[in-house]
Each structure stands twice: as structure tokens, then as C-alpha cells.
Amino acid sequence: MGLFDKIFGSYSDREVKRITPIVDKIDSLGPEMEKLSDEELKQKTFEFKDRYAKGESLDDMLPEAFAVCREASTRVLGMKHYREQLIGGIVLHQGRIAEMKTGEGKTLVATLPVYLNAIAGKGVHVITVNDYLATRDKEWMGQLYEFLGLTTGVIVHGLTNDQRREAYNADITYGTNNEFGFDYLRDNMVIYKEERVQRPLHYCIVDEVDSILIDEARTPLIISGAGSKSTDLYKIADFFVKKLREEEDYTIDEKAHAAMLTDKGVAEAEKAFGIENYADANNMELQHHITQALKANYVMKRDKDYMVKDDEIAIVDEFTGRLMEGRRYSDGLHQAIEAKEGVKVQRESKTLATITFQNYFRMYTKLAGMTGTALTEETEFREIYGLDVVVIPTHRPVQRQDHSDLVFKTAKGKYDAIVEEIIETHKTGQPVLVGTTSIEKSEYLSSLLKKKGVPHKVLNARYHEQEAEIVSHAGELGNITIATNMAGRGTDIKLGEGVLEVGGLKIIGTERHESRRIDNQLRGRSGRQGDKGHSRFYISLEDDLMRIFGSEKLQSVVDRLGLEETEAIESKMVTKSIENAQKKVEGNNFDIRKTLLGYDDVMNKQREVIYKQRSQVLEGENLEDSVQAMIEDVITNAVQAHLGNIDEDDFEKELGDLIKYLEDIMLPHGKFTVEELKTNSNEEITRKFIECAREIYKEKEEFVGSEQMREIERVIILRVVDTKWMDHIDDMDHLKQGIGLRAYKQQDPIQAYQMEGSAMFDEMINNIKIDTVRYLFHVKVEAEKPQRERVAKETGASHGGDSQEIKKKPVKKEPKVGRNDLCPCGSGKKYKSCCGREVV
């Protein structure tokens, strides 16, 4: 703590002091609310809604609304909010993050701002980390909201569109971040506005906000369709890399979580695949497959990063140890792991729509969050999301004793000491919760305890179903529970009878996580609501964190001391060294997330433009003006591209090419000749073409009817926009993967990505106009209602991992470029004078 904080108190202390008068006001309204009957209390909700409609702000109503909610909670749930919980509720209403320790009643705290903001009638979303918690909280707290005259809904996997729409139309909606994000993407793929399920994003409270906004920030939500690529190359690449030797043919960079070929490895690849130059751009697809095969075989670890379950690869969440059902690694990594493990390699998918949680949650008008551990990531919350963190005081002082780390020379010595400690503690009856960082390590520790005949329960991704049940009993006398990281988060560990007398729940950490926050979460499982408890971490110099990021200074101290395998050191210097290693990793991860956000912001702005225009097409009753403007643009651009600034000698040739080009898109064949138009100015030619196109379009509309034509326009525009946008997502992803490999002198890669991405976006918009006009003029119309259809059948949704390998270039299915067309590279020159010079 700095000198300033010692004198004036921390930022959180000052904020809590500022909020206290509002809490006093809520307290003073208590007796008045107690006098109201149940019906009168319920009527208060309708009174608040009326006052809001007349212009009174939610801030002005806060003390009274919180007092109403508090009284209703006392009657319905038998729980009255503490003053500290009122402070937490105010912080959440203000659009901030409330850090509240485990067991302080976060679920109850959320009812206050949820009730107040539901009065606005625009919908309140409460985000939880899994379907179990979403359903539990909706049923539990839903009693309170329904007593107060509000409706609640829950979004879980497997609901129909009608069920989802009903849940979103409720005053308060519970659900997981994945479900909300996927619904947003799906809503922006519909052909008819009635198919949308979400309302505009208004107010959102994210439970376990650090887990969702930081731990999962780098993994985008992806809706995908089946790709067309063969899976054979994954098996061939896997066969090739399995024969390679570490250091000689490839190297592993543990910090970057990557593997790469050495010069000798490159020579082996050239020999094996019969190619001259591995680095050649023509071999990009092969490079991609080999890179992913290397990562799958030598970086990704079975039972730590993924599991083989029912002959499929299931991803393990590194932060919770849970299986991430239905998710697949993106960019071909999942297929590479399937090839490695000898299970069926599924086809690589094509991305239809994607968004990161960072950008999804930043779309809410007001965002708030709560967690037991946020302060260590305060800078990131502020810089990325504009959220500040306020630490809420605990209702009772924390009595848990956090002991210094014990550092061992080897992993074996560490595990032997842990087993010894568990056995000694078990003799007293004190319950023990042991936190591990992977399934593999939890099962290794379990096998050691079995050999000693110590009864215990294991909680990891393999036994996901019993998670809440096992966790809820972890605080009972004599129980020993081994848990992968934060599995069971969101379920309280209540102490059984007689446990306080033996010292409360003991927490043993088997190694430090690379994030201090995850360590704090493990510690926080003990000592809830002022209970006694103990915590200690056991560390070895062979642990991943110490091996990759630990200081050489610490290693030399241990060497000088000549520690035996079973001996440990315990000192402030050691703890400091470990914390510095963690800070180094946290800083590194923050930089990666910030860089990714820089790239994603470019894509996000483009997505906003496309989705906004798409929404206007969905809502628009009359698209005629937009279509007429497209026709004009296509003709004007074509005339300019063919006839602008050309030699007189080339004029007739270019005019002939122009007529053919526009005949292919919209003009009737043989209507215009070079002979007839060659004496006209460019402006006259443009006018004649536009008049002709309008006349044809008018005849088509008269035949089919205006209402029918608008319907056809809507469907075709949406189909073209979606198809081009999907291709653009692939192109932008390929650009992002390749841009860092270029030697940009004095130029920021993100800036280069922005400039080139902008040019590609403009080209896409132009191609949308051309294809829309072509389809509208070529579509065979009948005088009947067009069939409603989806643009792309969604075949899968995944929360794919990010990847830093080179992505193979997507094949763009576009019309052949004419020699006199504008060059697609975006230079503004004709194709024949630019990239077309090299084409024979």
C-alpha cells in the first residue's frame, strides 16, 4: 500500500464512503416498507414504472426501489440485504465492477440493481458461467421478481427460437455468455425480422466477470458451416511431424505456446513433400497443416488441454478444468489433434459469423460485473471496458490464515509433502480442498492418496456431472476433495457441523497458476462469511510457471542451500520471486489481449456497418430507392473504369467491352452498339444506360407487383450481403495472420491491417452492389410469393480458440476479372495496367 493510500484510504475506501449516505437513506425507508401489505409492495413496481415514463431517473428512485426490493426479499426468500450488500448493489447499478469475497451473497446483491433497471422496461441480462447456475438463479431469485410483478426468463442450450424470444422479452433474462453471444450472431443472419429473438442490448450484469471478460476474452464466438476442404492433408502432416526430432528438426517455444521447424526440419519437409521452396507462397496450405500438426503433437497435452471422449476430442477449459462441450479449436488445430489421436478427422468449418466477448459486451448501454477477484486486473477492466473496480467490505472480518508458500526442489518432493500434509490433517477431521492445474495432475495426486488408503473425491472435467454435488460437501468433517482449478465455482462450500472447532476448511494449492487471480479464487473458497480457514501453496522448481518464467536467482539460491528432495524453503524473497513471475505472465497476456483487440476493433467497425445496413434492409418497407441507387452506382463506376482517361485510339474497343460487361449484369443483349454510342459523351452514355436499366426494372416490377418485388429485393440483398461478408471474414483473417510476417518499416502492423482491411471492405461493398443488381435483373420471377429461406444453414457453433499460426488463404469464388475492369487489388488502375500485366 502506497503512502497516499495510507493517508487518504484506497480508491475503493473513498468510493464506499461516498456511497454510504445512499445506504443510510435506504435503511431509513425500511420501517415504511415493512408497513406495506404484499399487494401494496407489488404496486410499488407499477408506480416506479409510471414515474420513469414521466421522466424521473432511476438514480432518483434508487433508495426507494432498493428498499422495496430488500423488504420483498425478506418476505419471499427470508433474506434481508446487509448494508454491505446494498453498497454492492449501488456499485453494480452505476455500471462498475463490485469485488465481493466468496460467500458474501453476490446472487442476492444482484437483485437490487436488476430490479431497479428492469423498471425501464428495456430488459436486463444476468450472465452466469454455466446453464446450471443460470437455471438455479432464475428459479431462486425469480420468486422475488415475480412477487414484485416482474417477469423472468432463462436462455439455455436447446431452446427453440420461440422459447428464446419469450425469454428475451421478459423483464429479466438469465443465461450464459455463449448463449447470449450466439443469439446476437444468429439474429444478424436472419432473412425476416420476425425470426430475431433478442431486443437491443440495454443493461447487463456479468457474474464471475473476470472469468468471462478476461479469461475468455481471447476466444471468439464462431458460427460455422461445413467447409469443402479434404481432411487427408491433416493425416499426412501428422505422419510427417511424428518422425521429427526435437531441437534437430523442430523447436518448442513454451512461452508463445508454439512449435516451429528448424532449417533442417524445413529441408526434411521439402524432401518429404517433393517441393523446392517450403517458404514459397504456393505452399502456404502445406505450411499451415505442418504448423498445426507440430502444435498438436508437441505443444497440446492430452488430459491437460483436451481429452479423448467417445472417440472425439473435447477441449478442457484451462481456467475451470471443465469440458467445453460443443466447442472446437479453430484454424484447423482441432483437426490436427484428431489426426494425432487417431480419431475421425472432421471437415474444417467455414466461419459464417464471429464476434469476441470483448466486443459483444461493449455493445450494452450499461455493463456491470461482480466477482471475488477483480482488483489484480483493474487496469485491463478500465482500459478495455471502461469499468472501474470497487472492493466491497466484507460483512464479517476475514479470519482465514494464508500461510507462506513452501518451495521444493522437485515435483516428487512436493507431492510427497502434500500427501503427508493431507494425511496429518485428515487425522484431525479438518476438511481439505486441494486445487490442481490439470486433470492429469489431479489424477496423479489421487493415485498417491489411493496407495496410502486415504478416502477422497476427485472433481475434474471427467466427472463434470457431479460437480455441484461434490463441491457442496467439500466443507464437511473429514472430507478430502481434489479439484481441477476453479471447478465448482458458483457453488458455496458451507462448513459442516464441528468443522469450525478443527480450524475450518484447509486449502492446499499444488502449484501457482500463471494468474494471481486464479490463486486468490482458490484461497477464497475457505473463510467465507468470517469463518476460520487455512491456505497454503506447495511449489516446486519443476512447475511450469517456475520453469518457464521463474528467476534464475531463485534456482541458484536453492542450489546453494543444497536442499534435499523432501526439504522446503519458506521466505518472503521466494514469495516475491513467484509473484514477479506471475506479474510477468499477466502483463504478457494483457498485451496479447490488447493487441488482439486492436485487430478486432477494425473488424468490429466493419461488422457494425454491415449489421446496421442489414437491419435496415430487414426493417425497411421500401427498398426501391436503395436498389435504384445501386443500379446507378454500378453503371457510373463501370463507365468511369472503361472510358475514363483513355486514349482516343482505345475508345471504341473499351466501349465494346463496357457494353458486354453491362449486358452480362443488366442490359439487354443487342440493345446498344458501339456505332450508335461512339459519338456520345461519357455522361450521355451513362444516362442512356441508366434510363434503359430503369425501364427494364420497371417492367419486371409491373409484371410481378410492387409488394412482391420488394420481397424479392429484400431476400436477394440479404443473401448477397451474407455471402460476401462470410468471404470477407475469411479474407480478413488471412490478412491478420499474414500481416505480422511482413517487414513493415516504420509502420504498425495494426495500422497496416486497418488500411488494407478498409480497402478490402470497400471492394466488398462494391461487389455487393454488382452481384445484387446482377441477381435482381437475372432472377426469374413468377407472380407468387417468394419462398422464405435462410442465407446459410447453420451447421455448428463453436467458441473457438485463437491461433497464431499462418492461415491458409481462402479461395474466393468471384467472377473472372476482365482486362479493362478495375484491378481488384484496390490500386484504382485497370487490371491490364496493374496485376493483369503478369497474366498471359
Curated annotation (Swiss-Prot):
Q: Give the cofactor binding note.
A: May bind 1 zinc ion per subunit.
Spell out the GO cellular component terms annotated for this protein, sorted alphabetically and separated by semicolons. Answer: cell envelope Sec protein transport complex; cytosol; plasma membrane
Q: Which Pfam families match?
A: P-loop_SecA (PF21090), SEC-C (PF02810), SecA_DEAD (PF07517), SecA_PP_bind (PF01043), SecA_SW (PF07516)
HAMAP family in the record: SecA
**Residues noted as binding Zn(2+) in the record, renumbered to the chain:** C823, C825, C834, C835
Region Disordered: what ranges? Answer: 787-821
List the PANTHER family hit by this protein, alphabetically. Answer: CHLOROPLAST PROTEIN-TRANSPORTING ATPASE (PTHR30612:SF0), SECA INNER MEMBRANE COMPONENT OF SEC PROTEIN SECRETION SYSTEM (PTHR30612)
| Principal location class | membrane
Which EC numbers does the record give? 7.4.2.8
Q: Which family does it belong to?
A: Belongs to the SecA family.
Cofactor needs:
Zn(2+)
Write down the top EC class of this protein. translocase
Drop me one GO molecular function for this one. ATP binding
Ligand binding (ATP): Q85, G103, E104, G105, K106, T107, D492
Name the catalysed reactions. Answer: ATP + H2O + cellular proteinSide 1 = ADP + phosphate + cellular proteinSide 2
List the InterPro entries: Helicase_ATP-bd, Helicase_C-like, P-loop_NTPase, SEC_C_motif, SecA, SecA_CS, SecA_DEAD, SecA_motor_DEAD
The protein here is known as Protein translocase subunit SecA
Provide the organism lineage as a comma list.
Bacteria, Bacillati, Bacillota, Clostridia, Eubacteriales
Q: How does it assemble?
A: Monomer and homodimer. Part of the essential Sec protein translocation apparatus which comprises SecA, SecYEG and auxiliary proteins SecDF. Other proteins may also be involved.
Q: To which species is this protein native?
A: Clostridium perfringens (strain 13 / Type A)
Function comment: Part of the Sec protein translocase complex. Interacts with the SecYEG preprotein conducting channel. Has a central role in coupling the hydrolysis of ATP to the transfer of proteins into and across the cell membrane, serving as an ATP-driven molecular motor driving the stepwise translocation of polypeptide chains across the membrane.
The way it spans or sits in the membrane comes to: Peripheral membrane protein
Subcellular location field: Cell membrane; Cytoplasm
